[in-house]
Amino acid sequence: MIKKCRICKGNLELILDLGKQPLANNLCKNKSERKKLYELKFCACKKCGTYQHNINISLDDLYSQYFYSSSVSKDLNDNALSFSEEIKKKYKNKSIKILEVGSNDGYLLKYLKDEFFCLGIDPSNNMTKISRSYGIKTLKDFFNAHSSKFIKNNFGNFDL
């Protein structure tokens, strides 16, 4: 459990206690199917005001099978479609390259891939597979110094 602010090491104040919760969208009808639950408490730093949850979840636990798919949200899809139309209008007849970090299931890039070179990067196995099924070039990795160097060496610079 986190006792001090991740940013400034100030004291944390409990704002909201949600009790034991599964990871994002990992909801099960039967208790026997239930995966690991986490004590989820939201805190605010008394010093810098940053809001944060009180636990560190291993990246493997969080992303090996990620359960939140952006495409299931009508609002997110509508927003992605509207945003992609703005990009298409602004960069019409231009050859640009688009990189989306945390591309999830490709919900944004699927609207742009036919007009522009698009690359997604996401650490989740299942979201990467979905994105690739749309024909989107997607790297399964975290975005960090190593992956950014790989991207630059293999794909060059990106415009967006």
Predicted regions and their residues:
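Conserved class I S-adenosyl-L-methionine
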Residues: 94-104
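Conserved SAM/SAH-binding beta-strand->alpha-helix loop
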Residues: 124-126
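Conserved SAM-binding strand-loop segment of SAM-dependent methyltransferases
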Residues: 135-150
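Conserved SAM-binding motif I beta-strand of class I
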Residues: 117-122
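N-terminal juxtadomain amphipathic helix
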Residues: 1-75
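Conserved SAM-binding loop of SAM-dependent methyltransferases across substrates and taxa
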Residues: 105-115
